[in-house]
Design a protein with these regions (language model features):
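Beta-strand-rich recognition/accessory modules
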Residues: 25-51, 224-345
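Boundary at the C-terminal end of the N-terminal hydrophobic targeting segment
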Residues: 17, 21-25
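Bacterial N-terminal signal peptides that target proteins for export
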Residues: 1-9
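Extended, loop-rich substrate-binding clefts of extracytoplasmic carbohydrate-active enzymes
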Residues: 103-157, 164, 169-171
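Acidic (Asp/Glu-rich), glycine- and aromatic
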Residues: 153, 157-211
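Bacterial N-terminal signal peptides
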Residues: 8-17
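Low-complexity, serine/threonine/proline-enriched polar segments
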Residues: 196-240
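Acidic-aromatic substrate-binding/catalytic surfaces of carbohydrate-active enzymes
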Residues: 36-117
Length: 347
């Protein structure tokens, strides 16, 4: 079993564990937890099965075999998601879901820099039969080190825990912008659904949100999210800042594919921004996305985000709300321990 990684030939596990800033709360990934054992996968993907769900977790290498035919390089996360023995992958087979897509600071940069998570090498780590991680060493441009844990729970829900440490002072606007994309394979509807209201309204109801084209009315923020992010006028990622007129009330949304609801749920304290594109994965293949912003970041400090993805039979919005309740409750009660560095207590 591999007990810790090396950077430049220097063991860093003990150094990080003894850091008063980083050791204030239990680590949930191998990023700063030297006691967490793992093995490095011999292949570019690992299959997780539990409940009625099969999830294939892949690094960002290209794969073309019987399990992942034609999977393109650059797309990491859940390369295949199936439920109940169905043959159809709910995600676009050549792409992925919960794919770590962008690192940015609001400044205009070349495409390869804004898509750096696609290009920097990822190591696939196996924790146990139900848990794997994608580790990415400090990236060449941004210097962001990260570990993404995918754990399949008893009912087949995927819990994703992302931990990162900025290793260099590279984010010129003082914040870190992170973006995850899920490319959905030919759903009946391109819409996503959440509880919220229009900006000018006072009553909360179910919202059926669509985007007329890529980058238009793309992002929905929380009712109380009044944060303003400095950015260049020619910043090229059109999904990031182009907001809709909707505000969500609960950190949750879902879309429907093959009579199944894909339910994305988040911790309230992570202040996630919901995003969507009608054509992110090609014609008829929408992208159902989310963003996490880390304000006033500190070099060497650990930041953490937790979310869950559930696949349940779709009847109507209320049935999805009821079925997802235990997971939403668990995320809401996942209180940040005193001293744990997160986006909220780093301001």
């Amino acid at each position: 079993m591999v007990e810790r990684f090396l950077i430049g030939g220097v063991a860093v596990g003990l150094l990080l564990a003894n850091s008063p800033t980083l050791a204030q709360a239990p680590a949930r990934t191998t990023l700063v937890n030297p006691s967490q054992s793992y093995r490095v996968a011999k292949t570019d993907y690992v299959v997780l099965n539990r409940g009625e769900v099969e999830a294939v977790i892949v690094n960002n290498a290209a794969v073309d075999d019987g399990k992942l035919p034609g999977h393109r390089g650059g797309y990491s996360g859940i390369a295949s998601l199936k439920r109940g023995g169905a043959n159809k992958n709910l995600f676009v087979p050549s792409y992925a879901g919960l794919n770590f897509e962008h690192i940015h600071d609001g400044t205009s940069q070349p495409r390869e820099i804004l898509f750096e998570p696609r290009h920097a090498l990822m190591e696939l780590r196996v924790i146990d039969a139900s848990t794997v991680e994608l580790y990415q060493a400090p990236t060449p441009t941004w210097g962001l080190e990260s570990a993404t844990r995918y754990a399949i729970l008893a009912d087949g829900t995927i819990e994703m825990t992302f931990e990162c440490i900025p290793r260099r002072d590279t984010f010129r606007n003082g914040y870190i912008g992170l973006f995850w994309a899920s490319y959905i394979h030919q759903p009946e509807s391109l819409a996503i659904h959440f509880r919220g209201r229009r900006k000018e309204e006072s009553n909360t109801s179910w919202i059926r949100a669509t985007s007329p084209r890529h980058g238009a009315a793309a992002t929905h923020v929380h009712l109380d999210d009044a944060r303003v992010w400095k950015r260049d006028n020619d910043f090229p990622l059109s999904l990031v800042y182009n907001r809709s007129n909707y505000r969500y009330a609960d950190p949750f949304y879902f879309g429907v594919n093959e009579d199944l609801a894909l339910v994305f749920m988040f911790r309230p304290q992570d202040e996630i921004r919901l995003s969507q594109s009608p054509s992110g994965g090609g014609v008829g293949n929408p992208a159902w996305d989310f963003q996490w912003m880390i304000p006033q970041y500190e070099v060497g400090r650990r930041y953490q985000m937790v979310m869950r993805l559930q696949v349940v039979p779709y009847e109507d919005s209320e049935s999805v709300w009821i079925r997802s309740a235990p997971h939403r409750k668990a995320l809401a009660s996942d209180a940040v321990q005193k001293g744990e560095p997160t986006s909220r207590d780093s301001r």
